[in-house]
């Protein structure tokens, strides 16, 4: 079986930026992650064994001088000490537990220092997705010529409509070749003539390097959720924004606000943070309703929302992005992160619906116990975590069922 992940930076930028801030602010924090397959997929016999071998192979994946040089050029906000850390970073199989039950369902857990395990999630999700297509024989049905042409058509529509967008598709891509093909098609289309819109780049750092594009991304829910587990959800957004400011000093200024819902975020989003952060990312809820909440919040602070960026990344496709662009452009500087719609859009192939969520955290290895955490989505009924933990967090935040 071929090795699926061969490059250290074949990963989303926000895993690296969060890793940097974790070391800077919570260097001794310990965490647990858990894999969730929302489709309850039955995996082929022996899948867990092969996935285990793929994870063990990560121990030989080390960052290269070329990757470091690229990040120094394109990610100038990263402090130089972080590149020294990455040079010495080594994956360990000891952080990961993989099993497959009698019904064929897959179970994956990570546990360890937050600064270590944070770089596993996206790589392991990409492994699971590609490995599933390999072991079920579907990989042979991936038509990359068709994907390239289809992606060019999508890009033409987005660019003509004035959309500013990026590829966000690493975690659930059909294969590395699929994402590489998509980014090549996006770049070729963008460079073919002048457009009303703009291709910003890709979340995948390695693919950004090979295509000489900007790597994009800031943070994921786990950053706020882990802090919520350690300190409680009421002030988690405040602590997260403060930690981000401490590390990046205003750079990487798009904040993902929906880890514990809009209401508590809004209470934490004071005028200094609203001025510091370039904008916000909408990743759940009704896009129009969420945008109107953001606009109203900025106005209440005396800030013109038209000067602020709003990144939409909530299960977008070409049609929904263009629709949002039409109404959002009058209220903000809209941009779009498009994932599976780009990197896993093949005839007769069902994209996987898989996530790995941070489920518990503790501030130091000295503590004898972890504190559970969860995510409270703006989509009703889509909270993630143990039911009793969700109830406890909702009670703490005075949220209604």
Describe the role of every protein-language-model region.
Residues 2, 211-401:
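Glycine-rich phosphate/ribose-binding loops and adjacent secondary-structure elements
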Residues 1-236, 245, 357-401:
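Ordered alpha/beta subdomains of enzyme catalytic regions
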